[in-house]
């Protein structure tokens, strides 16, 4: 049986060479939503006239006018449809009396069809028009159990009698077909021009249902002027992408949605971006509106999941019939739950499709932080439930606040509508997408493209439309000399193109001109697979990037193969190392996201990245695989030197070849990633890397960490950073202007390299002895001082201008003249405290104290407690009462700590005494 959309389309269109539609009948345009429905016939204006869908165990074919089901000219298609709808050969084919002429068409082709007033108990095919209002429940259950339904009709005439705003949810046919995501609309379908498609036609981006949805907005926001979402949690941003989904709450930028709703089938959904919003008393007016809307005023038998006990209490207080339940039951009219389990996903989706109301809330940013390499849009439990409703929870956050309700006109912004306007604008037509929405379109589009699209025409259709848009528009040439605004159409194109490539779409035509913009334009990928061996053992407590020494060119895909044990060990593949996300930068010197990471959870995987990049295998913490062979196709070698392994001859040969644009210099403790052009003049990396290893040993020694490092630190140069001149992390990021500082042995020896060691110091900082914001940019500099003095022989006074004696003295005096206020104790002023301790007691107390902190099980979060612990422990190390010293610096000394330290000799001649005496 043809169970996939592609196979179904092929079966339905077998032998169909033309669409012979009778001209005297005007069809209705069909609206498709959800993940199951797809079009079979689409006219030249993009209107769907015949659609197919699945529901439960059964299938539907929906035709936009009942007369088409009785037209002999469509016999080839009708015969295919009936054949495809049959659950198995020989099952009964039954036709409602309203389509009696169809019986003759079927019998004329040898199909034994019978006229029956309703579908029988035996599962087969039932054919009916869309105007019957008495068989709704029976038809839905017939399909759900595995039957096939052929249904046809138009809704524009019904709308003229009952009102256009009632068509979607009250037209008889829609009460049946909507459960499978197909709606008859009151919009006339044009039948002048259409062609027979060879593959599933594209679904129109957007059908305007403003009036119906505006009425729903009004009901949900009735009597509400403000939404206060300061409810104790940080909400996620919501992505509203379904044609019948709409926003309810936006932040003050009108760009971040935290509350939304949708119609799906015969049911309704309300989504909050954090479950705390469903339990907060300040959200009470909205929650009551939501329950009324979801239940259509019935408000009986509301099921509240046990995770939302406070919501249950709130509803009981208002006399609503509700109860705490551990799971969804069939007798509920509304189900309220959090978005953190997908165990009942299918059951919830069918509950909504058949008329139930769903109130659900949750955030996905925490899940995303705990599952790097997995897409929150595809794998977060809440999104497994919600995506089909046209709503998704993004892993981005919304700053909690109190936001006014301005009854959002969804004509201003809706993802599909914005994409449609964007397409029109790029085609030099009358698109009117506001400039400020282009940034949101890029973010939303990138999110939407992370929803798994394989086998889902609704999503693949958007991919196809985007490919066409981007192919026509071309990729903007973005660089430091040619930046683009982050809220420009060019930035949106960059974001959409990036994520489209990550989704697996063929972007070769989009990327064909990329190489001409880069230094890799004269490179070609290896025709033969390359096998490299990486270390699959990671005893540490953090994931490790393992370099492959290979580079994937722009716009290319690579096939990566590993063994069965490796595929089940939690490995990931990463393309690129420039991990800063520049989405919120004012100007862009490169695309906002240029790296891609995915799970290597099968033995062979195809991976692509529009922007190319060095290839890495990420080994998870605790992994014990040992040596792992990785076979990679379609990549080029990149310059790579490993201290102690790469010979000078190998390096010279490597660097002379036409290689990837980025290379790496590595030791067991640090890896430098810089442009290949900066490595061309490096004749022998060994002395440079030996010095780097000496510096890294000093970093580890001061931090009381094992050496060699369990995970080498990484430093990567980039054309643009998300913050600062450099920033810490894994990897440490620096600007291109700092590359020479990293790779010039002479410069390091003579001038030092304060910045990189400062960032390495950040990576050693520990919560227990950090007092943010005071010491955040202070204690990291201890490593800069230590490395410069103990390894490079550069005194602190020469290592940084701020450490000249006159500068230090000036800061001390200013601090004391102000009364030593703690709020002034930051950065260089705070560093001075530690330098004075070091200059009297040496480095050893710091080293032993940092080691001791690693053994302390519990340290309070507040700064005052942490500062007193540091005071106490340091005093014990040096066997002196340091209370007078820290009091002079303005530290808040606790009485019990002062009393405990009274047994030690008091440090009265501390370095501040000379300044205090002169006041």
From Swiss-Prot:
It comes from the Eukaryota. InterPro entries: Class_I_gatase-like, M60-like_N, Pep_M60_3, Peptidase_M60_dom, TCAF. It is found in: Cell membrane. Keywords: Cell membrane, Membrane, Transport. One of its GO terms (cellular component) is plasma membrane. Pfam families: M60-like_N, Peptidase_M60. GO terms for biological process: hematopoietic progenitor cell differentiation. Residues 543-842 form the Peptidase M60 domain. One of its GO terms (molecular function) is transmembrane transporter binding. Interacts with TRPM8 (via N-terminus and C-terminus domains); the interaction inhibits TRPM8 channel activity. Interacts with TRPV6. Belongs to the TCAF family. Negatively regulates the plasma membrane cation channel TRPM8 activity. Involved in the recruitment of TRPM8 to the cell surface. Promotes prostate cancer cell migration stimulation in a TRPM8-dependent manner. This is TRPM8 channel-associated factor 2. It comes from Mus musculus. The lineage of its organism: Eukaryota, Metazoa, Chordata, Craniata, Vertebrata.
């Amino acid at each position: 049986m043809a169970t996939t959309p592609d196979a179904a389309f092929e079966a339905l269109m077998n032998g169909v060479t033309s669409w012979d539609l009778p001209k005297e009948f005007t069809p209705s345009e069909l609206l498709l939503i959800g993940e199951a429905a797809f079009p079979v016939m689409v006219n030249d204006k993009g209107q769907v006239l015949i659609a197919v869908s699945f529901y439960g165990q059964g299938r539907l074919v929906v035709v936009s006018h009942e007369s088409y089901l009785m037209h002999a000219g469509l016999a080839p298609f009708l015969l295919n449809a009936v054949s495809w709808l049959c659950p198995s050969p020989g099952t009964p084919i039954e036709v409602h009396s309203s389509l009696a002429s169809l019986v003759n068409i079927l019998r004329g082709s040898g199909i034994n069809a019978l006229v029956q007033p309703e579908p029988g108990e035996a599962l087969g095919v039932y054919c009916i028009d869309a105007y019957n209002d008495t068989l709704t429940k029976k038809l839905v259950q017939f399909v759900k159990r595995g039957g096939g339904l052929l249904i046809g009709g138009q809704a524009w005439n019904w709308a003229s009698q009952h009102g256009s705003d009632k068509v979607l949810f009250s037209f008889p046919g829609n009460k049946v077909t909507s459960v499978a995501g197909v709606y008859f609309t009151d919009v006339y379908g044009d039948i002048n021009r259409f062609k027979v498609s060879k593959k599933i036609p594209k679904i129109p981006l957007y059908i305007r249902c403003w009036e119906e949805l505006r009425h729903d907005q009004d009901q949900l926001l009735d009597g509400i002027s403000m939404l206060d979402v300061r409810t104790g949690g940080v909400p996620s941003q919501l992505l509203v992408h379904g044609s019948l989904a709409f926003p309810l709450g936006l932040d003050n930028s009108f760009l971040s949605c935290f509350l939304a709703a949708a119609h799906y089938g015969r049911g309704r959904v309300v989504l909050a971006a954090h479950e705390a919003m469903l339990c907060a008393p300040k959200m009470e007016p909205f929650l009551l509106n939501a329950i009324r809307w979801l239940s259509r005023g019935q408000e009986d038998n509301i099921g509240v999941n046990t995770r939302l006990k406070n919501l249950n209490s709130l509803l009981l207080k208002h006399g609503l019939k509700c109860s705490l339940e551990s799971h969804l039951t069939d007798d509920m009219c509304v189900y309220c739950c959090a978005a953190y389990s997908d165990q009942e996903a299918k059951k919830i989706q069918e509950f909504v499709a058949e008329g139930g109301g769903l109130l659900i809330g949750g955030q996905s940013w925490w899940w995303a932080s705990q599952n790097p390499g997995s897409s929150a849009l595809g794998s977060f439990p809440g999104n497994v439930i919600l995506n089909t409703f046209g709503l998704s929870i993004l892993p981005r956050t919304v700053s909690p606040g109190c936001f006014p309700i301005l009854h959002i006109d969804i004509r201003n912004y809706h993802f599909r509508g914005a994409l449609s306007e964007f397409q029109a604008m790029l085609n030099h037509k009358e698109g009117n997408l506001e400039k400020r929405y282009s940034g949101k379109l890029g973010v939303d589009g990138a999110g939407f493209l992370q929803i798994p699209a394989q086998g889902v025409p609704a999503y693949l259709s958007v991919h196809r439309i985007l490919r066409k848009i981007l192919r026509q528009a071309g990729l903007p040439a973005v660089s430091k000399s040619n930046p683009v605004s982050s809220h420009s159409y060019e930035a949106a194109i960059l974001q959409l193109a990036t994520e489209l490539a990550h989704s697996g779409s063929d972007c070769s035509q989009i990327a064909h001109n990329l190489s001409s913009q880069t230094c890799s334009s004269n490179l070609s990928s290896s025709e033969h697979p390359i096998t490299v061996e990486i270390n699959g053992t990671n005893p540490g407590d953090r994931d490790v990037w393992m370099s492959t020494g290979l580079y994937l060119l722009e716009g290319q895909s690579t096939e990566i193969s590993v063994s069965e044990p490796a595929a089940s060990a939690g490995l990931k593949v990463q393309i690129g190392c420039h991990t800063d996300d520049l989405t919120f930068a004012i100007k862009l010197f490169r695309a906002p996201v240029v790296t891609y990471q995915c799970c290597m959870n099968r033995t062979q995987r195809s991976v692509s990245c529009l922007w190319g990049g060095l290839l890495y295998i990420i080994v998870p913490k605790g992994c014990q695989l040992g040596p792992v062979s990785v076979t990679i196709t379609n990549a080029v070698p990149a310059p790579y030197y490993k201290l102690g392994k790469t010979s000078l001859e190998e390096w010279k040969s490597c660097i002379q070849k036409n290689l990837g644009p980025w290379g790496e210099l590595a030791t067991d403790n640090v890896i430098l990633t810089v442009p290949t052009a900066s490595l061309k003049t490096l004749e022998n990396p060994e002395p440079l890397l030996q010095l780097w290893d000496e510096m890294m040993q000093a970093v580890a020694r001061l931090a009381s960490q094992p050496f060699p490092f369990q995970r080498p630190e990484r430093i990567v140069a980039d054309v643009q950073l998300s913050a600062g001149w450099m920033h810490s992390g894994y990897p440490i990021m620096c600007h291109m202007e700092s590359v020479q500082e990293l790779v010039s042995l002479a410069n390091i020896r003579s001038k030092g390299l304060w910045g990189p060691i400062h960032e390495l110091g950040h990576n050693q900082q520990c919560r227990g002895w950090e007092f943010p914001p005071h010491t955040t940019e202070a204690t990291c500099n201890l490593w800069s001082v230590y490395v410069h003095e103990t390894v490079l022989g550069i005194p602190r006074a020469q290592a940084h201008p701020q450490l000249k004696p006159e500068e230090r003295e000036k800061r001390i005096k200013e601090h004391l003249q102000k009364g030593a206020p703690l709020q002034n104790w930051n950065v260089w002023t705070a560093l001075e405290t530690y330098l004075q301790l070091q200059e009297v007691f040496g480095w050893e107390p710091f080293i032993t104290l940092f080691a001791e902190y690693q053994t302390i099980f519990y340290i309070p979060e507040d700064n005052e407690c942490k500062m007193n612990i540091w005071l106490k422990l340091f005093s014990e190390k040096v066997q002196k009462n340091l209370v007078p010293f820290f009091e002079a610096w303005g530290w808040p000394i606790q009485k019990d700590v002062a009393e405990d330290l009274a047994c030690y000799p008091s440090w009265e001649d501390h370095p501040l005494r000379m300044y205090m005496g002169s006041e």
